[in-house]
Amino acid sequence: MTRSALQMGRLTLVLCLLLQLVLVTQACFLGNCLNDGERDVDGREAMRPCKYCSFGQCVGPQICCGDRGCEMGSEEANKCREEDEDSTPCQVFGWPCTLNNPGNTNGKCVANCIGICCVTDTCVVSSECQKESKSGIRVGCQRS
């Protein structure tokens, strides 16, 4: 074999390996696939609403929040552990808020009347969640 034929063979081998690498990385991994094994073309996971608890929605495995506040570790809040059994992630309703929580700073405002911002493992009172309408009444709260 000539020297140029060897170089062409190596170049072809390198190109084939690069193509194979690209095809393998396009595979369906656990974190970016829907239940039927198809890759989500937008790169987003399918979402469903989080389960409801006695007076609001499940925010984490042991956190139930609604307009009257949040319960953590109570019997009712422990029903939220069922969320962990479902492989499809759920979406907590509420506008975004920021927590000073290492590794998980993107929370949701879940108790508008009180102004509580939660992530899956903790909640804090946040002025960011006490949004008011133009009339000065907190959004989602009833006048008493």
UniProtKB/Swiss-Prot annotation:
The modification Aspartic acid 1-amide is found at residue 36. This is Conopressin-conophysin. The keyword Signal applies. It comes from Conus bayani. Disulfide bonds join 28-33, 50-90, 53-64, 58-80, 65-70, 97-117, 109-129, 118-123. One of its GO terms (cellular component) is extracellular space. Belongs to the vasopressin/oxytocin family. It is found in: Secreted. GO terms for molecular function: neurohypophyseal hormone activity; toxin activity. Expressed by the venom duct. Gene3D superfamilies: Neurohypophysial hormone domain (2.60.9.10). It holds the Pfam family Hormone_5. The cysteine framework is C-C.
